C-alpha cells in the first residue's frame, strides 16, 4: 500500500494508483463551481496500457501514490522489439518493450540518460529529459529574412522523427526539441 496524500497536493508527473492500476498525472485542474463542492479533474496515463483517462476527485478525497522503483539509465540500442538501456552504475541491461515507450521513442538518442520506472522488476515507464538537442538532417532550404514569420515547415531530425520548425532552420542546424510534445524550442549554436 502506497502513501496517501490529499488530492489538493497533486502535481504533474506524479504517479498515483486509481482502481488498482498505476497512472502518471499528465495534467490536473482545480475546479471551484459557483454552487456545490470544489473538485479536481485529473488527466492521467495508465502506465501498463498507455491509455489516457480523465478522473474527477472531490477536493476532500485522498489518493494513493504509486510505489515504483526509479533507475537512471542510458539508452543503448533498439533490437526491433525492445529498447535496451544500461545502468551506468551496475552495468545491468534492461529491455523496455516498444509499447511502454510509445511516441517518446522517436526522440531517443544513443547515450541519452533517462529514468526507467519499474513495478516489481517490470519496466512500466520511461521518462526522457524534458528537452534535447537534435541535428536537422533533412528540410527545405531556408531563406535570409525568414525570421519574422511564425510559419513552420517539416524537418527530419537525426533520430528519424519529423518535427515542425521555423522557416529559417536549415539542414545541419542543431535544434532543441521538447521531448514531451515534439515541439521546436530554439536553434542551438554549438
UniProtKB/Swiss-Prot annotation:
Would I find Nucleus among this entry's keywords? no
Gene Ontology terms for molecular function: translation elongation factor activity
Q: Which UniProt keywords apply?
A: Cytoplasm, Elongation factor, Protein biosynthesis
From what superkingdom does this record's organism come? Bacteria
Instruction: Name a single GO biological process.
Output: peptide biosynthetic process
**Function field:** Involved in peptide bond synthesis. Stimulates efficient translation and peptide-bond synthesis on native or reconstituted 70S ribosomes in vitro. Probably functions indirectly by altering the affinity of the ribosome for aminoacyl-tRNA, thus increasing their reactivity as acceptors for peptidyl transferase.
Report the sequence similarity comment from the record: Belongs to the elongation factor P family.
Its protein name is Elongation factor P
Q: Which organism is it from?
A: Persephonella marina (strain DSM 14350 / EX-H1)
Amino acid at each position: 500500500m502506497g502513501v496517501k496524500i490529499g488530492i489538493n497536493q497533486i502535481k504533474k508527473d506524479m504517479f498515483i494508483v486509481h482502481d488498482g492500476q498505476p497512472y502518471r498525472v499528465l495534467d490536473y485542474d482545480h475546479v471551484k463551481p459557483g454552487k456545490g463542492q470544489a473538485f479536481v479533474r485529473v488527466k492521467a496515463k495508465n502506465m501498463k496500457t498507455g491509455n489516457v483517462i480523465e478522473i474527477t476527485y472531490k477536493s476532500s478525497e485522498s489518493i494513493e501514490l504509486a510505489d515504483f522503483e526509479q533507475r537512471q539509465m542510458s539508452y543503448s540500442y533498439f533490437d526491433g522489439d525492445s529498447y535496451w538501456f544500461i545502468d551506468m552504475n551496475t552495468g545491468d541491461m534492461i529491455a523496455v518493450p516498444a509499447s511502454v515507450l510509445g511516441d517518446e521513442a522517436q526522440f531517443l538518442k544513443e547515450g541519452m540518460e533517462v529514468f526507467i520506472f519499474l513495478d516489481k522488476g517490470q519496466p512500466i515507464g520511461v521518462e526522457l529529459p524534458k528537452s534535447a538537442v537534435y541535428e536537422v538532417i533533412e528540410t527545405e532550404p531556408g531563406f535570409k529574412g525568414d525570421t519574422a514569420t511564425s510559419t513552420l515547415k517539416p524537418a527530419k531530425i537525426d533520430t528519424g522523427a519529423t518535427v515542425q520548425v521555423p522557416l529559417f532552420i536549415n539542414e545541419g542546424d542543431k535544434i532543441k526539441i521538447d521531448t514531451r510534445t515534439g515541439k521546436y524550442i530554439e536553434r542551438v549554436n554549438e
